[in-house]
Amino acid sequence: MIDFHAAKRFNPLPMKTYLRLILAAVFALTAAARAEEKNGLSLTVSKTVVEKNDTHGNGYYGDKLNRTQALKASIKNLSFKEMPEGEVTWAVLLKRYSYTDTLIFTGTEKLKALKPAEITELIFGGTKITGYTGYSENYKDKTEWQITVKQDGKEIIKSQSTAAFDSLAKHAVKRDNAEKPNN
């Protein structure tokens, strides 16, 4: 007679948990920064907080957000020759949690000539982010962005945070007063 209760059963739960943690880490790392490579340039863009004046609340909504968020672009020359000077054109869409219209801020930054394998970082497009945390993501301002690198008037590389950026930008209200980050 075989005793089926004596043998230990295989428990797949720890492996599933481990796999979920690995997948969550991979998605978190890829969502943190958007990277593109084209025409000998690598463009990596991430959001960065340059000023933070959040207040801890004990009221109904939780903590109140009040920060300046900007874009940080790392541009690397992947080719074996020097890249000429260029310009970085950017646009940031800001959807306020308490406002129906989407605002668009635009600007242009100079890009210095890059030697082979040289990296330069630019911080631009500062916008005020407000809202409340603790109960719902719906009470926080949201941003989307698009960045284009041009050399000699020709588009070299373009990156955006969402595929729907162009259609969202068509309906946005134009603003030219994006804040200059303090970096």
Give a label for each model feature.
Residues E82-S98:
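Short acidic, flexible loop segments centered on an aromatic residue
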Residues F105-S161, L168:
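Short, solvent-exposed, Trp/other aromatic-anchored flexible loops in extracytoplasmic proteins
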Residues K16-A24:
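Sec-dependent signal peptide recognition
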Residues A35-A70, E179:
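Low-complexity, acidic Ser/Thr/Pro/Gly-rich terminal tails and inter-domain linkers that flank the onset
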Residues R67, P84-T89, E137-E144:
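Short coil-to-beta strand junction motifs in C2/discoidin
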Residues A24-A33:
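Hydrophobic h-region of N-terminal signal peptides that target proteins for export
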Residues I75-S79:
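Asparagine-centered strand-capping/turn motif at beta-strand->loop junctions
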Residues D3, F10-N11:
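Short, positively charged and aromatic/hydrophobic N-terminal segments
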